[in-house]
Curated annotation (Swiss-Prot):
ATP binds at residues 12-19. SUPFAM superfamilies: Actin-like ATPase domain (SSF53067). InterPro entries: Anhydro_N_Ac-Mur_kinase, ATPase_NBD. CDD domains: ASKHA_NBD_ANMK. HAMAP family: AnhMurNAc_kinase (MF_01270). Catalyzes the specific phosphorylation of 1,6-anhydro-N-acetylmuramic acid (anhMurNAc) with the simultaneous cleavage of the 1,6-anhydro ring, generating MurNAc-6-P. Is required for the utilization of anhMurNAc either imported from the medium or derived from its own cell wall murein, and thus plays a role in cell wall recycling. It catalyses: 1,6-anhydro-N-acetyl-beta-muramate + ATP + H2O = N-acetyl-D-muramate 6-phosphate + ADP + H(+). GO terms for molecular function: ATP binding; kinase activity; phosphotransferase activity, alcohol group as acceptor. Its EC number is 2.7.1.170. This is Anhydro-N-acetylmuramic acid kinase.
Amino acid sequence: MRSGRFIGVMSGTSLDGIDVVLAAINENIVAQQASLTWPIPHPIKEEILAICQGQSLTLSQLGRLDTRLGRLFADAVLALMRQENLKPTDVIAIGCHGQTVWHEPQGDAPHTLQIGDNNQIAAHTGVTVVGDFRRRDMALGGQGAPLVPAFHHALLAHPIERRMVLNIGGIANVSLLVPGQPVRGYDTGPGNMLLDAWIWRQQGKPYDKDAQWASEGKVLLPLLQDMLSDPWFALPAPKSTGREYFNYGWLEKHLARYSGLRGQDVQATLAELTAVTISEQVLLSGGCERLLVCGGGARNPLLMARLAALLPGTEVSTTDEAGISGDDMEALAFAWLAWRTLAGLPGNLPSVTGASEATVLGAIFPANPPQNRS
């Protein structure tokens, strides 16, 4: 079983940057050693958003974006390697999630698409890449998501305490860690995605820092109930979703039924939508003693306060307090999944994704031997 240094690369639905993490991994530990966030150029971000909202494009446009993202991921990895004085031979593999542009786990031909050519990453970094993690799970009848609960269980499960790990990225998802029971995990709905989309359209800001704008508003109950009536929220777990569903067009559809709404009130209502849909799923799952929050939403004081209020009797804290960086959690998870793939170990949890069996995930893109590199 190979152990050593792995790099994880994550570009999530929030599109707030590319997270790159270096970790030492073996069967007993995952020790984070360094990290950085690499910016996504605005034109690329706009192209990704357009695809996720169903805008048509040619195969040539998709191919070019796939290549450009692959180079961008490679640049992000190379920046971390320069920062840490690493040679390609110092790193066993890179685990790259890719950028999800479509995720449709229902229907007669379930599918998911992550772009960012892994061949580009392997060629330009000189390091073996493991990518395309989700489709093997879908081939076995699973949702292809979420995959991070397996990592949560490995690092954050407690022998006697009933815990849940909540990741509030663009989409929010939970992992239920109950001693003696199979791990469960699923998406709860929008996390930061609609909050970020609204403030971007209204103020040109990428996110609502410290929930300052939302805190100036009041919750619009009719709008909140209207959004909560979306049938997706009533679907049974396990379930998954993404920007192809909960996007700005979804929000516009609901806002079109009202007039004269103040921007800060809409922002406050979107924050409440995130908090309510998360807390409802926590309670439906039987609740927990401790809710460990990671992702960008863990730095949103309004969301954290509302979760604590909606979940009395539950200790709401961050994964940082448990020793794992909440900002780097998902990138760490894909470094760990790359290690499992190379070790021939399953990376999915059928109790989470609904797959018929546990399986090794991903495809391997080997680096050229050092003597073959120019």
